[in-house]
Amino acid sequence: MGRFKCLVDSKEGMEKFRAKYRIPPNVGIRYAAQGKWVDDRKTGEVVIPIIAFIEGGMTIPMGTLTKNFLRFFRLSPTQCAPNMFRVLRSIKVLNERMNLNLTHHDVNWIYNLHHMKGQGYYLKSRYPEVRLIQCLPTSNKGLKEDFLIFSRGWHDGLPCPTKEGKPGGGLTVNSYALVCILLSFPLSMFLTKFFFIFYFILMISQITVPPNPYST
């Protein structure tokens, strides 16, 4: 049992949690321990670590910055280390207090996505001298052992991935498919750039097409 189970292990506790984090009444919530949510999660449901709410500013429906970041990298919330939720929350606060419009692209420009076995994906500053967020904890031990499973209206129509994925994974389309696409256009469009296209086809042997991480 994780350290956060006591917050939601009773009906009264769950109601307080729902009220504190402003989770809509039409959203279903139930607790799942580490290693249990894989079998407990049903189609259309999402699993989120409790630490994401306590320290990561997670909201239901999910905030635009967090949702777009997860969609961009094809990650589910269960794959993210607490460090990632802290960074995204801090950037959200910067947007609100300083009237900024930082997006997941800005996050990706400053931070690199790394994976640590047993910990999940986390964010590391590309350059130590350039950091949006300071004083992040160096240890996440014991913080990702409690999860909540959300059902029904947990998203606004554009959900984040609910199944664990892998950044950069996907199906491949070889150069033959690329040639077929190019030949579907009038030849006159390419005559003046023939050598460029020929070089382009030779250099690109395959194109990565992202899988559909939103199917359950």
Language model features with spans:
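Residue-register detector that marks a fixed positional context within folded domains
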Residues: 1-216
